[in-house]
UniProtKB/Swiss-Prot annotation:
Pfam families: TruB_N. The keyword Zinc does not apply. It comes from the Bacteria. The lineage of its organism: Bacteria, Bacillati, Mycoplasmatota, Mycoplasmoidales, Mycoplasmoidaceae. Belongs to the pseudouridine synthase TruB family. Type 1 subfamily. Keywords: Isomerase, tRNA processing. Responsible for synthesis of pseudouridine from uracil-55 in the psi GC loop of transfer RNAs. This is tRNA pseudouridine synthase B. The active site is at D41. It catalyses: uridine(55) in tRNA = pseudouridine(55) in tRNA. InterPro entries: PsdUridine_synth_cat_dom_sf, PsdUridine_synth_N, tRNA_psdUridine_synth_TruB. It comes from Mycoplasmoides gallisepticum (strain R(low / passage 15 / clone 2)) (Mycoplasma gallisepticum).
Length: 214
């Protein structure tokens, strides 16, 4: 397979970083230059749009693409990283009723707002990745960023778990959404699974047939 000078859609596996996945791709297919259009959490899987060699000049435009995510969350647990990999900070004992949750999600259609990114993120603070500072318990503050939820739909709801399909603007932080959602009901939540199902015009049906194992 020749992936030089092309736009390639990768299904990033769970438990590796987007950068590590990109390096595996470059090494496996002998690609000299490549970039992707948006970091996925190590916990997440799904669509990673990669541009190679001459097509990398298109990344600035690809970075503007809207995204779709399927997130699975668990109520009643809050961690420092906002996901199941983090240290548990607080637990609660309340789960909203399905009608409450559905009504709130419906109210978010075409909702633009300022979102606070998680401290455990790839954003840079004075040249250092925020997650590196967070791991060292260094105090710092991130600024809220403008974003938009186009649609939020409840897919399933059982016990303390909910699955929600999100159509959002680029730069949206799903982990922050999970925490903010729970706070609307005076409870807690953490992200337990995340799949990016679409990025711009590309979806999971467009991914190449290759397993990126370590």
């Amino acid at each position: 397979m020749d992936f030089n000078n092309k736009i390639v859609i990768i299904d990033k596996p769970k438990n590796i970083s987007s950068a590590f996945c990109l390096n595996l791709f470059k090494k496996r297919f002998n690609i000299k230059k490549a970039g992707h259009n948006g970091t996925l959490d190590p916990l997440a899987s799904g669509v990673l749009v990669v541009a190679t060699n001459k097509r990398t000049k298109e990344l600035s435009q690809l970075n503007q693409d809207d995204k779709q995510y399927l997130v699975k969350l668990k109520f009643n647990t809050h961690t420092d990283s906002y996901d199941r990999l983090g240290k548990v900070i607080r637990t609660t004992n309340y789960v909203p009723e399905i009608k409450q949750l559905n009504d709130y999600l419906t109210s978010l259609d075409n909702h633009s707002f300022y979102q606070l990114p998680p401290n455990f993120s790839a954003l840079k603070v004075n040249g250092v990745r925020a997650y590196q500072l967070a791991r060292k318990a260094v105090d710092f503050e991130l600024e809220k960023r403008p974003t938009t939820i186009y649609k939020a739909k409840l897919i399933s709801y059982y016990d303390d778990y909910a699955e929600i399909l999100l159509d959002v603007k680029k730069g949206f932080y799903v982990r922050s959404f999970v925490v903010d959602l729970a706070s609307q009901f005076n409870t807690t939540a953490m992200m337990v699974d995340l799949v990016r199902t679409r990025s711009g015009q590309y979806s999971l049906k467009d991914v190449i047939d290759y397993q990126f194992n370590k």
